[in-house]
Amino acid sequence: MNTLEHTIGNTPLVKLQRMGPDNGSEIWVKLEGNNPAGSVKDRAALSMIVQAEKRGEIKPGDVLIEATSGNTGIALAMIAALKGYRMKLLMPDNMSQERRAAMRAYGAELILVSKEQGMEGARDLALAMAERGEGKLLDQFNNPDNPYAHYTTTGPEIWQQTDGRITHFVSSMGTTGTITGVSRFLREQDKPVTIVGLQPEEGSSIPGIRRWPAEYMPGIFNAQLVDQVLDIHQREAENTMRELAVREGIFCGVSSGGAVAGAIRVAESTPGAVVVAIICDRGDRYLSTGVFGEESYSQGAGI
């Protein structure tokens, strides 16, 4: 009999109908918001907990600790509730109210750091708590079980769903788990696929992805697996996110808008390409931030 964890993965891959250039290229997007906790992070959350269980590092009833900007925390809170763990999540206090509410709804304890401390501060505090013996740190930024989830599931799904036709893979970079795992799988196939990462432009803020300082670059990231990194401005990501909703019927978050903006750039410069981008989550997590507000649309953004 299937349990909730068996509903993670095997998400749809759909072709954009009204966005993108008219040069024979195709843009396909993988709808990770269809996972039970609503994001691509469901895959990594399940992998980190299940693999730690297999190694005997954790057991139900234990306290788990993680620093998160939102989606990983929601996913971990769901898996922890399903498997009987106590979850402590640390995040900056400028993350959306919807994300906080979802974590608490699953029974997680939420510990906030200031927006000035940011994710770096959340990571430092999570490590300090683990060192004091307050729980097991899952450490998504340095845990190989994070990209392993995408090497064993997301990558193979994309390859199968495109019948091996994919020429370019585009993904926003946060923990870098998705791009690292998928690119590792694609590198092992019998054709070259160009891997493109997305990061915010200097000075831009895009929830869920980062332009990491060198000392905080996730340990799981392998630069040799990424062919190109594109800088995306916050406004471009938000406009593309809104355009996806009103032109394609895809209601997603800002980082997904950034990924599709990057995919459009790739498609425009590569006639005949088959480009796959990750839609990381759903737009309902961002309603309180105002990015879907009437003012944005009245100014012509994203339409």
Segments and roles (model prediction):
Residues 1-303:
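PLP-dependent amino-acid enzyme catalytic core
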